[in-house]
A protein has these predicted regions:
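Alpha/beta enzyme core
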Residues: 1-4, 8-13, 18, 30, ...
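Glycine-rich phosphate-binding active-site loops on the catalytic face of alpha/beta enzymes
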Residues: 8, 79, 127-144
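Glycine-rich beta-to-alpha transition loops that act as phosphate-gripper elements at the mouths
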Residues: 50-56, 107-116, 135-137
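C-terminal helical cap(s) of enzyme catalytic domains, especially alpha/beta-barrels
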Residues: 140-155
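Long, well-ordered amphipathic alpha-helical subdomains in the mid-to-C-terminal portions
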Residues: 164-195
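Conserved small/polar residues in nucleotide/adenosyl-binding loops
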Residues: 196-203
Length: 204
């Protein structure tokens, strides 16, 4: 590997309960000590994915001061609090604060589900270096093709048949992968069902 990505963005309750993922943001002193050691001893490039805090918006400014100290390759920001999960609207103003405070490349993550949503975000935050698309791809495996079609006239929007083919290929690949690493059909089916059950979306 040439790069390590530290995930401080996962809001899952089971992860946060162990002070991992976004749970680490709740102990900023320990986080800073951890990053001090990692950046001192790790020979690889390091990027970080982060939320903007655990419970309150005023947690973001102290976190930015911590991130200012370290020569990270990239900071990937999902501008929601951990307690918000994936609900509500991303706090774009928090990303704008990072643009002012940090010198490292910044990547935006969160609620990119269509060409229109990407355009809105880029219009409000024109200084974004890159974007990361996560759950939007799980919801719509054809999203990348739709984004390409929206950005250039040489790429056509996928037809219904093409979208269905992509979905089937995605589903088959995912099912096969789960079957290889999980024990029993029940566990495999549970993981697959999470993709298609909106009430269980936060468990992904």
């Amino acid at each position: 590997y040439r790069e390590i990505n530290l995930n401080l963005g996962c809001p899952s309750g089971t992860v946060v309960a162990r002070n991992r993922g976004a749970g680490f943001l709740g102990t900023p002193r320990e986080l800073e000590d951890f990053l001090d050691e990692v950046f001192e001893k790790c020979p690889l490039e390091i990027s970080i994915k982060t939320r903007i805090g655990m419970d309150y918006m005023d947690e973001w400014a102290p976190l930015l001061k911590i991130y200012q100290k370290f020569p990270m390759k990239e900071l990937i920001i999902h501008p929601r609090l951990q307690k918000e999960g994936y609900k509500g609207t991303p706090h774009l103003e928090a990303f704008a604060e990072a643009v002012e405070a940090l010198q490292c490349p910044l990547c935006y993550n969160g609620d990119i589900t269509s060409p229109e949503s990407l355009t809105q975000i880029l219009t409000k935050l024109p200084s974004i270096d890159t974007v990361m698309i996560g759950r939007g791809i799980l919801q719509n495996p054809g999203l990348l093709q739709e984004l390409k079609a929206a950005s250039t006239e040489s790429v056509a929007l996928p037809s219904c048949e093409e979208r269905l083919a992509v979905l089937k290929e995605f589903h088959t690949s995912l099912l096969t992968g789960y079957q290889e690493i999980m024990s029993g059909d029940t566990n495999t089916l549970y993981k697959i069902c999470l993709l298609y059950t909106s009430d269980a979306a936060d468990d992904l």
